[in-house]
């Protein structure tokens, strides 16, 4: 049978329960098909939107963009799953701007994200793509003054991007109207449909005036059974896009571990426990020629220990964690994106959604629990963005290897022991 490829005018099948797009799998025949295109011009996009697309360097659609844009333009619900860094944000932003009527001074597109950082990044992408269209975009998220959000909404934005708590609050105080929403986007949907956000998302959805007609688009790199169940409650005859490349393996990212064997037998505190990992990390930094990297560790307390230790050893780095204010986190991200600091220490805020150009190496100083296994995929997905090559290094103790190997088996991926003569070049 015919397979989905990245060539122009490929087709995918539609089933009674929805349309399913899977790369590298045979397609079953059916009566209706969704067409994918190889160039932006083939979509019949607005001229000013095309100008915005080319102005930010989007030369051709990525595979997820080919698969997702047309169904949204055609009015379909979608649930999309694709590896990190493949252009999911661009997919829903382009489609949303195409269907948005800029002559109407009402909010038509609502995008929810789990953190302010991701929401801000999404809002910036809408602004960049819609810069020639007169698109008005409002960012609503915790950490910013309510008064500023009211001012933003008074400008009658076409598109609102925000975090669930702040969006729900602005709806409750009658500052954000749900009367004209035509597209509801849930980004990082696996996180948004978990218990922490699920009720807020459902509450916001219930407030949409025409919820029986509104389109819903869900995007994520991973989904668990619970999130899939919840999605089925609100999606109608959706297009299911599954582009995970062999059960979640992140294409282009080489994964390794360094086994430090036993953890320190005698220790006075967390720094003593982490010391062998810190020494190993520092040794790599000194001996290898690396660009910018991110170092992930689970807790904000441990992130502070790693940061302080590296600073004491005169290694230039930045720290981002929940202990910082929102303004401090934004300044840190902007400095790092601007080239300040060789590495960024993160307690997990950046494991989802954040795009940092020219990042090729991710270090993980611990292993997420198996229950939070998707965190591993999101962590290492910070490298190898948009088809570039990336490297992920897990620095672990012997007792952590069991969990790492369980994640390896679950995602049908390969995590090798780092060779002694390995070079990052």
UniProtKB/Swiss-Prot annotation:
Highest taxon of the lineage: Eukaryota
Renumbered ranges of motif DEAD box: 187-190
Record's keyword annotation contains Cytoplasm: yes
E.C. number(s) listed in UniProt: 3.6.4.13
Reaction equation(s) it catalyzes: ATP + H2O = ADP + phosphate + H(+)
Leading EC class: hydrolase
UniProt-listed SMART domains: DEXDc, HELICc
CC annotations in GO: cytosol
Domain Helicase ATP-binding: residue ranges: 69-241
Subcellular location field: Cytoplasm
GO molecular-function terms, A-Z: ATP binding; ATP hydrolysis activity; RNA binding; RNA helicase activity; translation initiation factor activity
Boundaries of every Helicase C-terminal domain copy: 252-425
A Pfam family recorded for this sequence: Helicase_C
Record InterPro entries: DEAD/DEAH_box_helicase_dom, DEAD_box_RNA_helicase, Helicase_ATP-bd, Helicase_C-like, P-loop_NTPase, RNA-helicase_DEAD-box_CS, RNA_helicase_DEAD_Q_motif
Motif Q motif, chain ranges: 38-66
This protein's UniProt keywords: ATP-binding, Cytoplasm, Helicase, Hydrolase, Initiation factor, Nucleotide-binding, Protein biosynthesis, RNA-binding
Binding site for ATP: 82-89
Function field: ATP-dependent RNA helicase which is a subunit of the eIF4F complex involved in cap recognition and is required for mRNA binding to ribosome. In the current model of translation initiation, eIF4A unwinds RNA secondary structures in the 5'-UTR of mRNAs which is necessary to allow efficient binding of the small ribosomal subunit, and subsequent scanning for the initiator codon.
Subunit structure: Component of the eIF4F complex, which composition varies with external and internal environmental conditions. It is composed of at least eIF4A, eIF4E and eIF4G.
Domain remarks: The Q motif is unique to and characteristic of the DEAD box family of RNA helicases and controls ATP binding and hydrolysis.
Family: Belongs to the DEAD box helicase family. eIF4A subfamily.
Protein name: ATP-dependent RNA helicase eIF4A
Organism: Encephalitozoon cuniculi (strain GB-M1) (Microsporidian parasite)
Organism lineage: Eukaryota, Fungi, Fungi incertae sedis, Microsporidia, Unikaryonidae
UniProt gene name: TIF1
């Amino acid at each position: 049978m015919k397979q989905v490829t990245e060539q122009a005018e490929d087709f995918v099948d539609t089933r009674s329960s929805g349309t399913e797009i899977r790369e590298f799998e045979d397609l079953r025949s059916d009566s209706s098909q969704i067409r994918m295109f190889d160039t932006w011009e083939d979509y019949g996009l607005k001229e000013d939107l095309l100008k915005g697309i080319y102005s930010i360097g989007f030369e051709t659609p990525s595979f997820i963009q080919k698969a997702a844009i047309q169904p949204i333009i055609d009015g379909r619900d979608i649930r999309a799953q694709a590896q990190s860094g493949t252009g999911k944000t661009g997919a829903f932003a382009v489609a949303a701007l195409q269907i948005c009527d800029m002559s109407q001074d009402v909010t038509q597109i609502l995008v929810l994200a789990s953190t302010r950082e991701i929401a801000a990044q999404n809002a910036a992408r809408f602004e960049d793509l819609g810069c020639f269209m007169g698109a008005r975009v409002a960012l609503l998220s915790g950490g910013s003054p309510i008064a500023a959000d009211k001012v933003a909404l008074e400008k009658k934005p076409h598109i609102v991007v925000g975090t669930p708590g702040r969006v729900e609050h602005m709806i409750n105080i009658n500052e954000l109207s749900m009367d004209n929403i035509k597209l509801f986007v849930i980004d990082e949907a696996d996180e948004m449909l978990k218990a922490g956000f699920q009720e807020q998302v459902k509450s916001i959805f219930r407030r949409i005036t025409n919820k029986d007609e509104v389109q819903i688009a869900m995007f994520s790199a991973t989904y668990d059974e619970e999130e899939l169940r919840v999605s089925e409650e609100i999606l109608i005859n959706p297009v299911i896009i599954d582009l995970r490349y062999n059960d979640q393996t992140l294409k282009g990212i080489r994964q390794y571990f360094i086994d430090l064997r036993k953890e320190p037998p005698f220790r006075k505190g967390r720094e003593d426990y982490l010391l062998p990992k810190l020494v190993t990390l520092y040794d790599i930094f000194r001996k290898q020629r690396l660009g910018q990297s991110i170092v992930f560790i689970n807790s904000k307390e441990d992130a502070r220990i790693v940061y302080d230790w590296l600073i004491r050893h005169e290694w230039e780095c930045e720290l981002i964690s929940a202990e910082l204010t929102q303004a401090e986190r934004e300044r840190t991200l902007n400095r790092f994106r601007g080239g300040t600091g060789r590495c960024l220490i993160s307690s997990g805020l950046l494991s989802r959604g954040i795009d940092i150009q020219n990042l090729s190496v991710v270090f993980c100083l611990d292993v997420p629990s198996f229950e939070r296994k998707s965190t591993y995929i999101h962590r290492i997905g910070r490298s190898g963005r948009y088809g570039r090559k990336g490297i992920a290094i897990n620095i672990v103790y012997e007792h952590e290897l069991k969990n790492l190997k369980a994640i390896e088996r679950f995602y049908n991926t390969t995590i090798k022991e780092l060779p002694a003569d390995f070079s990052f070049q």
